[in-house]
Swiss-Prot record:
Location within or outside the cell: Secreted
One GO cellular component, as annotated: extracellular space
Xref: InterPro entries: Ig-like_dom (IPR007110), Ig-like_dom_sf (IPR036179), Ig-like_fold (IPR013783), Ig_sub (IPR003599), Ig_sub2 (IPR003598), PSI (IPR016201), Semap_dom (IPR001627), Semap_dom_sf (IPR036352)
The protein, known as: Semaphorin-3F
Organism of derivation: Homo sapiens
Residues carrying sugar: 53, 126
Length: 785
């Protein structure tokens, strides 16, 4: 046991601790992984830590012109500073009335998760006001908020807001404080303008909505009834007629979940402008219905409905399937149909943005996620293609081959192709009737290259959100993907062309953005401020887009990371700026070649190798630790017995086991002593990570030092000090300077180990067994006893 304890102390002293992974290296392994504590230690992230009694945070609007971000949660509207979300946040407490909450509970809803005012819509009304809607405890309500820079509260109420109470609200609206005058620079809610939120905000907070406020008209994909069965795309407010999709028509919408809405112009003619909705729904055309399909739908902004048919209903609504699949060698595709999030990356041409979408697989047998990219050219080609039509003896879906009415269904009035028609009410009845029965396009929209950009299969998480940033590096422009997961982490990914057919995915980092893991709900990015803002049920976090110092202190580490944000400046890995005049900045994102980029700096790579000394006993085991900074590096172990010998590579044998953490040597032999070097190779760049000098001790020598014969040991003379511990005798026997470190560690170890009660100094001795006997109880005692 003492021999094993000596080996354990030596292993702890040199930092070696064996670990046995259960699986091989997985693809898409992050180069840097940071826990929430480690992320905070970098000073590049901040968590919104005001103690509000609320949950379900959603980032609903980013206003970079005013440096504000507007967040909705249960019973609160927050206005946060984009530079620092904890700096003077503006808070409005907007709760449902107690009577409404009581009615909600009586209807069978949960008092905490459903019977509250969950803010789900914040849209810019004009330069001074916001339009805000909440579920209102299953009674949707909307009003206007003055977007000021100061809170409508006295210092006392501001303190209460920080503690979680905020400004008092009555009957679902904020009561104005009499001490705070209503001025333009005050952030306050206008209760006198409270109105119904039906058709704007869902009743159920678990149902998502997608909305856009355009020209003071609100377009929203939403469920409009208490039971959550009537879904529609609505147009409310404004001067035009209120519009919606055809009610209870499964060909139009079939149990949809709305994800995103985006205005994308078709041409220079404003009458051609269309609003695109991204959603998923149960499909009627699937071979094995019901199945969930991802959809993209669109409507014309100047749609007024039909004259006799489709009155006050969209007469230009069309939809198509979004396909995100991995083609197999046998021609069978693996589909990801559950659309989760959409990010629209603007380009110099406002008519042709790039669409990024996150998908997950349906069902529980196959668990996976994917990111697909779509072009507007492909989307428009599908909407200009054939319509889906049911015909034939089997009543199956076919492309419509009959006579197409004029104007083509889905064309906007007064646009490029219909300049003489000023309204959809001027369309012939045959066009309106065709639209009612043929809203679906026959062809589907496929991603670029007809394959996903990023795929995750077999991972213990699913992707939930996406944000994309364009970064100018020394060798070109790159798109950096930030992917949120249902584990509360954010992954930073770039995808590079490997050859003509394949792409190479690099996960630069994965960080935990919340102290308590929770699925990422919403995420927005500010390229101007180089910040990412992430929201979940537990709070809001904003973090920098780059942490260059986390890649390492060497030029090779910085270059091998291939992060477009970072470059070697001659001293450290720091933020790359295209306008920098320093000639020593080294960056190579496309190839990551430190041999070419880091000339003059690579000599320091081997000097930074960790050197240590370990001891082992023949017949036992030893673990040599080696963890390269990059998980993509190839690790090799080299052995050199004596300084003049040639180094040879250690290959996997019965006695040698290579793990992700190092090298395990089993059944040590005296011939195993020597210098072990762990080298890491990545992109043809090789450097030494660690060197371990291993000393193998004979079992007989160790046993003789730890257990000397009794005849040789004489009783200590009077007045002598405490006897020398056996391990110290072993150190004196070996006469090696490194063994003094083991003695040092052992002394410190025994100093901190609490003594047992029997050996503790000053502890009362336990009584003898005869003293512990219970005395016999005599009934009659002498008086003087």
């Amino acid at each position: 046991m003492l021999v094993a304890g000596l080996l354990l102390w030596a292993s702890l002293l040199t930092g070696a601790w064996p670990s046995f992974p259960t699986q091989d290296h997985l693809p898409a392994t992050p180069r840097v992984r940071l826990s929430f504590k480690e992320l905070k230690a970098t000073g590049t992230a901040h968590f919104f830590n005001f103690l509000l009694n609320t949950t379900d945070y959603r980032i609903l609007l980013k206003d970079e012109d005013h440096d504000r971000m507007y967040v909705g949660s249960k019973d609160y509207v927050l206005s946060l500073d984009l530079h620092d979300i904890n700096r003077e946040p503006l808070i409005i407490h907007w709760a449902a009335s107690p009577q409404r909450i009581e009615e909600c509970v009586l209807s069978g809803k949960d008092v905490n998760g459903e019977c509250g005012n969950f803010v789900r819509l914040i849209q810019p009304w004009n330069r001074t006001h916001l339009y805000v809607c909440g579920t209102g405890a299953y009674n949707p309500m909307c009003t206007y908020v003055n977007r000021g820079r100061r809170a409508q509260a006295t210092p006392w109420t501001q303190t209460q807001a920080v503690r979680g109470r905020g400004s008092r609200a009555t009957d679902g609206a904020l009561r104005p404080m009499p001490t705070a005058p209503r001025q333009d620079y005050i952030f306050y809610l206008e209760p006198e303008r409270l109105e119904s939120g039906k058709g704007k905000c869902p009743y159920d907070p678990k149902l998502d909505t997608a909305s856009a406020l355009i020209n003071e008209e609100l377009y929203a994909g939403v469920y409009i009834d208490f039971m959550g069965t009537d879904a529609a795309i609505f147009r409310t407010l404004g001067k035009q007629t209120a519009m919606r999709t055809d009610q209870y028509n499964s060909r139009w919408l079939n149990d949809p979940s709305f994800i995103h809405a985006e205005l994308i112009p078709d041409s220079a003619e404003r009458n051609d402008d269309k609003l695109y909705f991204f959603f998923r729904e149960r499909s009627a055309e699937a071979p094995q219905s019901p199945a969930v399909y991802a959809r993209i739908g669109r409507i014309c902004l100047n749609d007024d409905g039909g004259h006799c048919c489709l009155v006050n209903k969209w007469s230009t609504f069309l939809k198509a399937r979004l396909v995100c699949s991995v083609p197999g060698e046998d021609g069978i595709e693996t589909h990801f149909d559950e659309l989760q999030d959409v990010f629209v990356q603007q380009t110099q041409d406002v008519r042709n943005p790039v669409i990024y979408a996150v998908f997950t697989s349906s069902g529980s047998v196959f668990r996976g996620s994917a990111v697909c990219v779509y072009s507007m050219a492909d989307i428009r080609m599908v909407f200009n293609g054939p319509f889906a039509h049911k015909e034939g003896p089997n009543y199956q879906w076919m492309p419509f081959s009959g006579k197409m009415p004029y104007p083509r269904p889905g064309t906007c009035p007064g646009g490029t192709f219909t300049p003489s028609m000023k309204s959809t009410k001027d369309y012939p009845d045959e066009v309106i009737n065709f639209m009612r029965s043929h809203p679906l396009m026959y062809q589907a929209v496929y991603p670029l290259q007809r394959r996903p950009l990023v795929v995750r299969t077999g991972a213990p998480y699913r992707l939930t959100t996406i944000a994309v940033d364009q970064v100018d590096a020394a060798d070109g422009r790159y798109e950096v993907l930030f992917l949120g997961t249902d584990r509360g982490t954010v992954q930073k990914v770039i995808v590079l062309p490997k050859d003509d057919q394949e792409l190479e995915e690099l996960m630069l980092e994965e960080v935990e953005v919340f102290k308590d893991p929770a699925p990422v709900k919403t995420m927005t990015i500010s390229s101007k401020r180089q910040q990412l803002y992430v929201a979940s049920a537990v709070g809001v976090t904003h973090l920098s887009l780059h942490r260059c110092q986390a890649y390492g202190a060497a030029c090779a580490d910085c270059c091998l990371a291939r992060d477009p944000y970072c470059a070697w400046d001659g001293q450290a890995c720091s933020r790359y700026t295209a306008s920098s005049k320093r000639r020593s900045r080294r960056q190579d994102v496309r190839h990551g070649n430190p041999i070419r980029q880091c000339r003059g700096f690579n000599s320091n790579a081997n000097k930074n190798a960790v050197e240590s000394v370990q001891y082992g006993v023949a017949g036992s085991a030893a673990f040599l630790e080696c963890q390269p900074r990059s998980p993509q590096a190839t690790v090799k172990w080299l052995f050199q017995r004596d300084p003049g010998d040639r180094r040879r590579e250690i290959r996997a044998e019965d006695r040698f086991l290579r793990t992700e953490q190092g090298l395990l040597l089993r059944a040590l032999q005296l011939s195993d002593r020597g210098l072990y070097s762990c080298t890491a190779t990545e992109n043809n760049f090789k450097h030494v990570v660690t060197r371990v000098q291993l000393h193998v001790l004979g079992r007989d020598a160790v046993h003789a030092a730890l257990f000397p014969p009794l005849s040789m040991s004489a009783p200590p003379p009077p007045g002598a000090g405490p006897p020398t511990p056996p391990y110290q005798e072993l150190a004196q026997l070996l006469a090696q300077p490194e063994v003094g470190l083991i003695h040092q560690y052992c002394q410190g170890y025994w100093r901190h180990v609490p003594p047992s009660p029997r050996e503790a100094p000053g502890a009362p001795r336990s009584p003898e067994p005869q003293d512990q006997k219970k005395p016999r109880n005599r009934r009659h005692h002498p008086p003087d006893t």
